[in-house]
């Protein structure tokens, strides 16, 4: 269960490995000692001073990490951030099982008699929805899925393009977890770097990708693009024919040799119903991978599991991604499969219903507050299959200076959100959720999803997501009250 060579070579960790039968076999070491063990019994562990960290892995449950000694307390916040980004906390259901076993000082059992059936339902549904040509991979969360993708791509590049620099091309203002994790991976691994991909406001994704790929060609580097379509938070869709042309474009190095073709990794959490990989025309000549956060539409917010698929050209890449999903023990749990098997069959209908509600609400806001700038897909794009249920709202502002205008707008953002929550407490929530079964979700990206984004790239606008089940008349009534008092 411990892939020694990959963890050293791909992840860049430096360590010595020693197998011990009992704690007394652990010798003094001038460094950090990590004890890794597997157990079927959850119990209190008494650690020797020689052990700095104790990782106990419980099959099908997760793992428990004990930090030993005051001298190691300063690592805890960093460990928690890794758990938040590169992996995931033990699921609530598994935590309950672990606590029960701990209280009883006993072994535990996780019974999932229909797990194979649930796995088949989930995989078949994903293939039908995405039109993918590879077997879907299902992870414990969207971020753990992205981590497996990134580490799988790094592993592939190290094996096939030895010594060449690896470039992850990522929008600087995209969803906080995506952005933060990509930069953390680059900071931890030699020869890996993140390149900013401007996609919003006055920038065009296709043009930005073209410029960056031309620059990377000169360096003879390995390009991996991570992008969201539609973009987040401004919900913009690039010209897909132009994007196809840019991705397929033949480029030369300074020595006039062919460059390494890019891999296009698409986060399509906003529109998981759009079959990007099913199109013979769109990405047929490009290595394309798509992934989705399961905490949104796939499960309706009932679990965090995410999934990943690829087109025919990515079969070798998908093997690497699967390898790293297993190394990190980040596969979906049995309960997550059960939830996805129940919710995925209705996903496309829920997406359609949520889009209809969102379009209705956006049209209402446009009519009653025309001075507000709304970012949402056009009806033409919706007819092409882009039907998100999220929009961004740039409210009108006042003031004689730029600072006064910005401060007024930021206060207005909060005034609107707080009014919605106060007037419709059973439906309106102040959080970043999307694709939930019911309700509306309001946030300011700059102070939520973009927590680790550079200040200049943050978006101080209102982001709103609408669900398929919502009291739209009440939402319109409250918004009218807000707009009348601006």
Task: Label every model-predicted segment.
Residues 3, 7, 111, 117, ...:
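Active-site C-terminal subdomain of aminotransferase-like
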Residues 125, 129, 135-366:
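Conserved PLP-enzyme active-site core in the AAT-like
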Residues 14, 45, 56, 68, ...:
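Detector for Asparagine
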């Amino acid at each position: 269960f411990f892939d020694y060579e990959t963890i050293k070579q791909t992840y860049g960790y430096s360590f010595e490995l020693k197998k011990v039968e009992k704690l007394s076999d652990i010798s003094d070491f001038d460094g950090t000692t990590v004890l890794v063990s597997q157990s079927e019994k959850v119990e209190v562990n008494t650690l020797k001073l020689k052990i700095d960290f104790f990782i106990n892995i419980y099959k099908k449950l997760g793992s428990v990490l004990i930090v030993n000694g005051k001298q190691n307390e300063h690592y805890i916040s960093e460990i928690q951030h890794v758990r938040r980004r590169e992996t995931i906390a033990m699921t609530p259901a598994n935590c309950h099982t672990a606590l029960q076993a701990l209280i009883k000082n006993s072994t535990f059992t996780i019974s999932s008699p229909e797990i194979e059936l649930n796995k088949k339902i989930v995989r078949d549904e994903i293939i039908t929805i995405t039109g993918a040509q590879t077997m879907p991979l299902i992870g414990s969360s969207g971020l753990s899925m992205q981590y497996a993708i990134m580490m799988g791509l790094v592993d592939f590049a190290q094996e096939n393009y030895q010594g060449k620099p690896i470039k992850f091309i990522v929008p600087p203002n995209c969803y906080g977890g995506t952005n933060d994790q990509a930069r953390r991976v680059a900071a931890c691994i030699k020869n890996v770097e993140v390149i900013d991909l401007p996609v919003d406001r006055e920038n065009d994704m296709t043009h930005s990708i073209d410029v960056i790929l031309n620059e990377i060609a000169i360096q003879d580097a390995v390009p991996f693009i991570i992008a969201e379509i539609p973009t987040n938070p401004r919900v913009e869709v690039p010209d897909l024919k132009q994007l196809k042309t840019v991705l397929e474009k033949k480029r030369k190095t300074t020595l006039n040799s062919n460059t390494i073709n890019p891999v296009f990794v698409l986060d399509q959490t906003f529109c998981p119903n759009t079959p990007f990989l099913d199109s013979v025309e769109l990405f047929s000549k490009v290595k394309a991978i798509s992934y989705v956060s399961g905490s949104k539409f796939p499960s309706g917010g009932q679990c965090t599991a995410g999934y990943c698929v690829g087109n025919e050209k990515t079969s070798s890449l998908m093997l690497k991604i699967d390898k790293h999903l297993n190394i990190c023990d980040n596969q979906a749990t049995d309960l997550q499969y059960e939830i996805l098997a129940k919710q995925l069959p209705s996903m496309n209908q829920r997406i359609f219903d949520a889009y209809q509600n969102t379009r209705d609400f956006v049209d209402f806001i446009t009519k009653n507050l025309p001075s507000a700038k709304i970012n949402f897909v056009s009806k033409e794009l919706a007819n092409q299959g882009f039907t998100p249920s999220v929009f961004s709202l740039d409210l009108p502002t006042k003031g004689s200076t730029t600072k006064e205008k910005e401060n007024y707008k930021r206060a207005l953002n909060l005034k609107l959100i707080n009014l919605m929550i106060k007037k419709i407490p059973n439906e309106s929530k102040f959080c970043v959720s999307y694709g939930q079964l019911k309700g509306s979700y309001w946030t300011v990206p700059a102070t939520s999803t973009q927590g680790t984004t550079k200040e200049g790239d943050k978006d101080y606008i209102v982001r709103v997501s609408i669900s398929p089940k919502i009291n739209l008349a009440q939402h319109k009534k409250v918004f009218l009250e807000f707009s009348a008092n601006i």
